[in-house]
Structure formats: C-alpha cells, structure tokens
Amino acid sequence: MNRNVFLKNTVILTGASLALRGIGMVFRVYLAAQIGAQGMGLYQLITTVYNLALTIATAGIGIAATRMITEEMALGGGQRLRSLCKKLLLASLVLGLLAAGLQFFGADLAAGLWIHDERAALSLRILALSLPVIAVMSCLQGYFMARRAVGLTTGAQMAEQLLRIALIMAILPAALGKGLGEACAAVVLAGTAAEVVSGGIVWWGYRRDLRQVPGSGKNVPAKGVLRRLWSIGAPVAATRYVGSTLRTLENVMVPGCLAVFTGSRELALEQFGALKGMAMAVLFFPFSFLTTLSTLLLPEITEAYAQ
C-alpha cells in the first residue's frame, strides 16, 4: 500500500463527498421552496422506485470491477486489462439496459400500484434513460478505484451536481405552472442530462488512462470473466436487492399510513417530503467518512491478497 496515495485519495473522496452532500442539502431547501412539501414527497417516492431499478443496474458491478482489475494489474501485468474491461463494460451495459427497460415500460404500473399517483409515470420514464449510463459509470468508477486514480471521477461528480443544479434552476420555473407531475419531470430531466454529461467525462478519462497502463496495448484475451464476475458480484447484488426492495416497500407504505392517520393524501405527501426530503438527508450526512474508507480499502486488500 502506498500510504501517500491512500491518504491523498482519502482526502479527495472525503472532501468531495462532504461538499456534494452539503451542496445537495442546501439545494434541497431551494427545491422545497419551489415545489413545496407535497412536491418533495412525490419526488421522494419517484426516487424510491428509481433507486430499486438503480440497484438492479449497478449492484455488485463496481465492487467486482475493482477487485478483478486490481487482481489483473497485480498478477497479470495489465496484458489482459483491455479485454477484461470490455467484458465488464458489456455486462454493465446489459444490466443497465435491462433495468431501464423494466422501469420505462413498467412506469405506469409502478406509478399506479406503488406510488398511487399517476403523475409519477413521466418522471420514471425519464429517469429510466439514465440507467445504462450509470451502470457503465459504476464499472468505470471501479476501474479508476483499482487504478487509485479518483480525481477524475470525483471531478465528474462535482460537475454533474453543479450542472444538475444549474439546469433545474433554468427549466423548473417553466414547469411549475403545469402541475407537480411536470415539475418533478423537469427536476429528473435535469438530473438525467447531468448524468449523461458526467458519464461522457468519465468515459473520456477511461479511454485516455487505459492507454497509459503498461502492457494494456497487447490485448491478450481475458478468460472466465463472466464466471468471476458472477462469483464476486452475485452475493453483493443479492444483499443489495433485498435491502433495496425492503426500503422501497417501506417508503411506499409510509405515505399510505400517514394518509390513513391524517385523512388526506396531500398532507401525507407533505409530511413524507419533510421527513425524507430534508430530515433524513441531514441525519445521514456523517456517513460520508465511512463510505470513503470502505471504498478505498477494497483495492488495497485485494492487491495484498492477490500477492
């Protein structure tokens, strides 16, 4: 382990994570002022369903990519790296397209049966378009984590957040007069566009970095990639699928229970938006430190085990 690199990456990731969460919380205040507590409640329900699809698209891919690429660089000298990355990216894209198809074509069903609000369907379809991009980005982030080069992905995340905020502030006022459904659609459209731009930045950085890896130009075929990907990613994915499903069910049930208690679906959405949109964001703010350390330790432990 190169301690200087590890400490540098820890500082970069922790600082960026804190900055992103801080900017996000401040922006939530602006967003809540624009669309109201009820709009925040609807938006949170939309993201609840989206997060389930996001788990299907990305669970296990980033961790598997980090481990497999770290092992290849430690033992294989990078000769099979190009072939390995192609197969990992293809698997990521397939999962992303699968999740996108499920969410896009199941948007009406999810809006009616889970969210109990037909206004959510348009936003779910828009968000589905971002899933293939995010799935591929998850794999590329695993690549850069294995390379101990987190600067590019961190910069892309910062650019994504700032672009998302700028786009929301630009297009949201025009959608506010059309209803909460259209307002939420404007918010997620801005987020989807920002994801695509961020994905393009990371892809450009990956293509540039791969050429600099010693031995990567030989393009030696990597064998057993899918089997190895399954053995690493399946347990992680299964755990996250269960956790994400339970969280989705919980978040879907809470507004219904609040509606029974208050006697009003609108008031229930307002209370749910205040809870999930603001209070929980503040509560989970300190987890930035734990997430950073656990992420950075993975390639170090993998390399030590491989050697």
Q: What feature does the model see in each segment?
A:
Residues 1-23, 79, 83, 219-243:
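N-terminal membrane topogenesis motif
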Residues 10-18, 124-125, 129, 144-170, ...:
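Alpha-helical transmembrane segments of multi-pass membrane transporters/permeases
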Residues 59-74, 283-307:
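Helix-loop junctions and terminal segments of transmembrane helices
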Residues 98-121, 175:
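Short membrane-interface helical motifs at transmembrane helix boundaries
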Residues 7, 44, 77-94, 226, ...:
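Interfacial transmembrane-helix starts/ends
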Residues 155-170, 178-208:
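Hydrophobic alpha-helical transmembrane segments
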Residues 31-52, 184-185, 224-232, 255-284:
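Interfacial/gating helices of multi-pass transporter permease domains
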Residues 17, 21, 48-51, 87, ...:
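Residue-level recognition of pore/gate-forming positions within transmembrane alpha-helices
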